[in-house]
A protein has these predicted regions:
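Conserved HGGG/HGGXW glycine-rich cap/lid loop of the alpha/beta-hydrolase fold
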Residues: 17-66
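Conserved loop-alpha-helix segment in the C-terminal half of the alpha/beta-hydrolase fold
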Residues: 226-266
Length: 294
């Protein structure tokens, strides 16, 4: 596996790649996108397997993992969408399947819609993001914290710092992961450290503070309407964070007609919890895609 630094908006972005010299160049490349607070390390059980048949890339979104966490950036879906679009066009240079988990799923869908013919497919694993017809505000760390503590108090930098310090404690990270993994076998020290270590970077607290004000982003139904590539929905159906059965119903109402679905007995991060099942489902679906024209 090759690791390297790519630059976006002048900032260093951590990337990994596997399989480029060993696979058929006629098959689409694959770009993997992590969720909030995670990194390329979260694809530890997927890259080695998928790299046997495809050119596989993964990157850390700006603000996360080993990538830069600069002040002054407007963190949110638009930034991460544009980062993925630039990476596909500048680094990969051919049609690419983009797969994302949680927040990374929203960014993957937005990038896939923007890339048009440069996108060979989109894979969403328990993706985040709103629909136009949703009346309730989006859920996530910000919503949970507001309900628990109160919106007014969260404007306090002191309270934000205390919350941040608690959330990055190893015991808190492990407890949170145990809540969203049904099978806890892979909730190990390596996973906990992959989340904790980036939180020690000087800019990490600044990125964390933005989570309370990240804009909702373009509705998923609008992105589905703009998407011209095949779509695969991979569900960890026992995800307690997003009410996966209800969320799945919303996706079924709005997703393109030819969408493929795979439902797994897993939580919020099926790619790491049940990687063998996710890898098999991905490889089966990838084999059905038309060969891209280069």
């Amino acid at each position: 596996m090759e690791t390297f630094t790519w630059r976006y908006l002048g900032h260093p972005v951590h990337c990994v790649q596997q399989g480029a010299s060993e696979v058929d160049e006629e098959s689409p490349a694959l770009l993997l996108v992590h969720g909030f607070g995670a990194s390329t390390d979260h694809w530890r059980h997927n890259i080695p397997v998928l790299g046997r048949t495809h050119e596989v890339h993964a990157l850390d979104l700006l603000g996360f993992g080993r990538s830069a966490k600069p002040r002054g950036l407007s963190y949110g879906g638009s930034l991460w969408r544009d980062q993925l679009v630039a990476y596909v066009r500048e680094r990969i240079g051919r049609p690419t399947v983009i797969a994302g988990n949680s927040l990374g799923g929203f960014a993957a869908l937005a990038a896939g819609a923007a890339l048009q013919s440069d996108c060979a497919g989109v894979v969403l694993l328990n993706a985040a993001g709103p629909f136009s017809d949703e009346q309730q505000p989006p859920k996530g760390w910000g919503a949970i914290a507001r309900q628990t503590i109160g919106s007014a108090l969260l404007k306090s930098p002191v309270l934000q710092r205390l919350l941040f310090e608690n959330l990055r404690r190893p015991a808190t990270i492990r407890r949170t992961l145990n809540q969203v993994y049904v099978d806890k076998t892979n909730v190990d020290e390596a996973l906990v450290e992959s989340i904790r270590l980036p939180s020690l970077d000087p800019g990490a607290f600044g990125v964390f503070r933005t989570v309370f004000d990240i804009p909702r982003g373009q509705p998923l139904d609008e992105l589905f309407a703009d998407l011209t590539a095949p779509l695969l929905l991979l569900w960890g159906i026992r995800d307690p964070w997003i009410n996966a059965p209800g969320r799945r119903s919303s996706f079924q109402r709005h997703a393109p007609q030819a969408t493929t679905e795979v439902v797994l007995d897993a939580g919020h991060c099926p790619h790491d919890e049940v990687p063998d099942q996710v890898n098999a489902a991905l490889q089966d679906w990838l084999a059905t895609l038309p060969q891209p024209s280069t």
